[in-house]
Amino acid sequence: MPELAFPETGEVKTITTDCECSTDFVERSEKDILIAELNNKPSATLADYEESEPGPVVSKRKEKVVDLERKYEKLEERLFSFKNIASNDSLVAFYTRFPNYQTVMALYDFLNPGEHGENINYWLSGKNVDSTPKSMKQERPMTLKPVDEFFLTLCRLRQGFAEVHLAHLFNISQPTVSRIFISWVNFMYLKLGHIDIWPSRELTNATMPEDFKAKYATIRVIIDCTEVRCEMPSSLLLNSELFSSYKHHTTLKALVGISPKAFFTFIGQLYTDGISDREILERSGFLNLPFSNGDSVMADKGFTIEDILLLGVSLNIPPFLGMSDQMSAEDVIATQEIASLRIHVERATNKVKKFRIFDGVIPFSLFGIVNQMWSVVQYTGPHNQCLNCIIFEFNDGII
């Protein structure tokens, strides 16, 4: 019990009080308490506040909140995000190489990363975040929305932006950019890799251009090797394996195949440039493709592979000079015809290099996902027939 002292008399008395503690205060919301403090009414409730006229302090604070919300909306509009460029087709094409917002979203919906990116195995410092329980994974803090992570990935592939530049654009850290890019490239590679891009003989015939029908109607695929430049290693041994005398630079080399209609139908992995055309064809899995009897393959002179092609599959390459001093008129015509048709595969690979990440020098930091990137840019290019079908389906026949 509390005691009260009286100095004048020297008495000390014990004071008893009967009071009942109310829980009303505990049950009030934080908003009730704040309003009560602002109006100097300790017992005020939200209902009391709503019935009364707001005080000048409350009015000022309300005005400040409204002003801050307006400023926030304006700042959000100035952020670099896919939402803020979606209505501008030229910007969408510049950053993603897709013609419009609908096309990008058709691919995004096909990939289906999940509302919060829960379908993606996020990479982090060499460890896969998928080892984390799914409940924890779904609650991870998202720096960017999944659609903006997708946009960031397309920006880097299309324009070849450096990580530090993307970090500045999206207002995130450079390691976060790296984590997002690696995760999304692997995710896209796995999803798109399930698409069968090898067309049937019937589809090849149905889409055969007139240029081929006269003399090369049996062509199933046109193959060629292409190179992309990579960072020069400090190791002399590795440097010698990567160096290309043709490009005068260290390069990686891949086998690609297109249909007569100029769609990619085979995407090989990247190898060191020291590998021969014959060896890269044997190691790439090209010989395991389901050819039909009577098919033919068109290639350059370097592909002396007729002896290793499947039974019933022939090879169309420019004729060799042999022991003669000059070619016959027939051989010259055949060389010119094949060269004029093979130009389509060179044009297709040049379109891939319009994704500027492959137009420049591939850094060592991306060697771990270079094959995934190589496949993704070919699957997502406008020259890919299967991607066009995906876009057509998800756009309800718009394209």
How does the language model describe each region?
Residues 2-3, 159-399:
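Short, well-ordered secondary-structure "scaffold" segments embedded in the functional core
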Residues 24-27, 57-60, 66-67, 74, ...:
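General helical secondary-structure elements
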Residues 2-144:
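Charged, often Cys/His-bearing segments associated with DNA-binding zinc-finger transcription factors
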Residues 145-160:
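Short, amphipathic alpha-helical "recognition" segments used to contact nucleic acids or chromatin
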Residues 78-79, 137-139, 148-151, 235, ...:
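Short, flexible segments with low predicted structural confidence
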Residues 1, 64, 100-103, 148, ...:
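Alpha-helical interaction elements in eukaryotic regulators
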